[in-house]
Design a protein with these regions (language model features):
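Surface-exposed patches in mature extracellular/periplasmic domains of secreted proteins
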Residues: 89-108, 188-196, 251-252
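Short pre-active-site segment immediately N-terminal to the catalytic Zn-binding motif
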Residues: 153-176
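Catalytic zinc-binding patch centered on the HExxH motif and its immediate surroundings
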Residues: 116-149, 201-202
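The catalytic-center signature of Zn2+-dependent metalloproteases
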Residues: 170, 177, 182-234
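Disordered inhibitory propeptide/activation segment of secreted metzincin zinc metalloprotease zymogens
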Residues: 2, 29-75
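A short alpha-helix/helix-coil micro-patch that ends at or immediately precedes a cysteine
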Residues: 65-105
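Secretory targeting and sorting signals
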Residues: 1-35
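Short, well-ordered secondary-structure micro-motifs within conserved domains or adaptor modules
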Residues: 95-129
Length: 252
């Protein structure tokens, strides 16, 4: 059983056969060819694989989101349905939001491809900090599953992120999706944008609409009522598609 590793903290948050499998993977992902490569790739525009946590790929056979207790299920279940559907439909990796309670402690990896969600006050002992604890497969370096510990402060305060209720909710959704992204194998894609020699908070690429990746540290993503909580198409989603392709490409 692999051991969990602590992800970075977030603030208020065979050649022919292999080739055929790769082509099938790209087709099932439902994205443009430019979203993936013909060799394993671990970073691209607006995304980066979480190789520091031993994750190099995303297994195609699906993941299940479960909950540490009934409170976590009641409070957080709805925040996972959107990104779960997006990964299922656009990446081709089934992600199911269940009603299951799993009491595996956060210090241990859950069973294969389970993602356990916790709703807890200051999981790191610091105001406004949530955390992902991704696990990886020792056999092939794919995302195994893990634990997501969401800081309850985001919900106990109605204006934690913003006094604007719509914006506040978009931030909540993005915070949840950000942590899910870590479990699925995405790291922070920040880079030294201003070339001052330091990679800083919010230093991330922007798309034509001005949005940064949802995986940007300490926060990013769409901030609208309709798109909040989604992986940004040309950044995060492209990265997840590549991680899925990597699963096959690493077997060649």
């Amino acid at each position: 059983m692999p051991a969990p590793k602590t992800a970075r903290i977030h603030r208020t948050l065979y050649a022919v056969a292999a080739a055929v499998l790769t082509i099938v993977a790209l087709l099932l992902a439902g994205g443009p060819a430019r979203a993936t490569t013909t060799t394993p790739t671990y970073k691209g525009t607006g995304w980066k694989a979480e190789t520091s946590q031993g994750i190099y790929s995303l297994a195609p056979d699906g993941y299940t989101i479960v909950f540490a207790d009934a409170t976590a299920r009641t409070k957080l279940s709805k925040y996972f349905t959107g990104p779960a559907y997006q990964v299922t439909s656009s990446v081709g990796v089934p992600v199911t939001v269940s009603t299951t309670i799993d009491t595996t402690p956060a210090s241990s990896c859950p069973s294969r491809h389970r993602i356990i969600v916790h709703y807890t006050y200051r999981p790191l002992g610091t105001k406004g900090m949530s955390q992902a604890r991704p696990c990886h497969s020792l056999a092939d370096g794919s995302a195994w599953g893990g634990h997501i510990l969401m800081d309850s402060e985001y919900w106990t305060s109605g204006t934690w992120f913003s006094a604007n209720s719509t914006l506040n909710e978009a931030y909540r959704k993005n915070a949840v999706t950000h942590e899910l992204g870590h479990i699925l194998g995405l790291d922070h894609p920040n880079y030294d944008k201003d070339r001052d020699g330091v990679v800083e908070n919010y230093e991330c690429v922007k798309n034509s609409a001005g949005w940064t990746p949802v995986m940007c540290s300490p926060s990013g993503g769409y901030r609208t009522s309709t798109s909040g909580g989604k992986f940004v198409t040309e950044f995060d989603l492209a990265g997840l598609k590549q991680l899925r392709a990597n699963y096959y490409l690493r077997q060649t």
